[in-house]
Amino acid sequence: MNQAIADRGKVVTAAATGINLALGVLYSWSIFKDAIAQSVKEGAPGGFTWNLSSLNDPYAVACLCFAFGMIPAGKLQDARGPRITAMAGGLLVGAGMVMISMTTSYTGWLIGFGLLVGTGIAFGYSAATPAAIKWFPNNKTGLIAGIVVA
């Protein structure tokens, strides 16, 4: 293998690992949920007024959007490449996080965290692993996939 290609593969793998690290925001839901539940229980003006039984709904919507969003994200990654797909994912996750930072409404969190963040994560994941794997021979793809998603 050419040294320039090997170096490029390492850079892409490091970038893909960084993307996946950032996409771990999905798994921070329990922190958000605890803060929302505390706000509901305190009943402070301007705080969250959700029904406690619906606290997991934004996470569930995010997981569904993540799963089903992989289909168009994969098609975009195949057609336009990982840069465009990763950028779309980053913009969606960023927009969702900005949106939820400015609202306490249940619908706002369903759209912001559920739809935007969930779909953005799908686009990010679909860009990262395939891009890294393409730079290595077939006998290394399992190792590289493991490094990227670890």
PLM features: what roles do these ranges have?
Residues L52-S53, N138-V148:
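Loop-to-transmembrane helix entry/capping segments in MFS-fold secondary transporters
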Residues I36, G114, F123-P137, I144:
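Intracellular juxtamembrane helix-capping segments at the cytosolic ends
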Residues I31-F68:
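Extracellular/periplasmic helix-loop-helix junction of adjacent transmembrane segments
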Residues G96, T107-F123:
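Hydrophobic core of transmembrane alpha-helices in multi-pass small-molecule transporters
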Residues A6-S28:
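Pair of pore-lining "gating" transmembrane helices in MFS-fold secondary transporters
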Residues D34, I71-K75, P130:
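Small-residue-mediated transmembrane helix hinge/kink sites in multi-pass secondary transporters
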Residues F68-T107:
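Conserved MFS/SLC helix-loop-helix module at the cytosolic interface between two early adjacent transmembrane helices
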